[in-house]
Design a protein with these regions (language model features):
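Flexible "arm" and connector segments at domain edges
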Residues: 1-60, 64-100
């Protein structure tokens, strides 16, 4: 599903900002994308504090969507993220941190 959404984001990147939320956000640039990610991150935190599972799922989905927009804007692929996760799989977070 992530790849499908990412592919649509890449497609919408070329749409008119008047006709696409993704295109309009990308047209506004990095600061607008990052601001939206910050807003969505805060909403995830509030939903988690409220311990409302349905709200958390909704807000996490919004955050992931906006992270995918950032990835499309920066030309970071799903495969790039997958490869990074594969490198980290099987080692503790502390080991991974030391290797950075």
């Amino acid at each position: 599903m992530f790849q499908r959404v990412y592919d649509v984001i890449l497609e919408r990147k070329n749409y008119s900002p008047d006709n696409s939320y993704v295109a309009s956000l990308m047209d506004k640039g990095m600061d607008s994308i990052l601001k939206k990610i910050g807003e969505e991150s805060a909403e995830v935190i509030l939903a988690a504090k409220n311990e409302n599972r349905k709200e958390q799922i909704h807000e996490i989905t919004d955050l992931w969507f906006h992270l995918l927009i950032l990835m499309g804007y920066q030309e970071i692929t799903i495969e790039d993220i997958s490869q990074e996760l594969k490198k980290r799989f099987g080692q503790s977070g502390l080991e991974e941190k030391v290797q950075r």
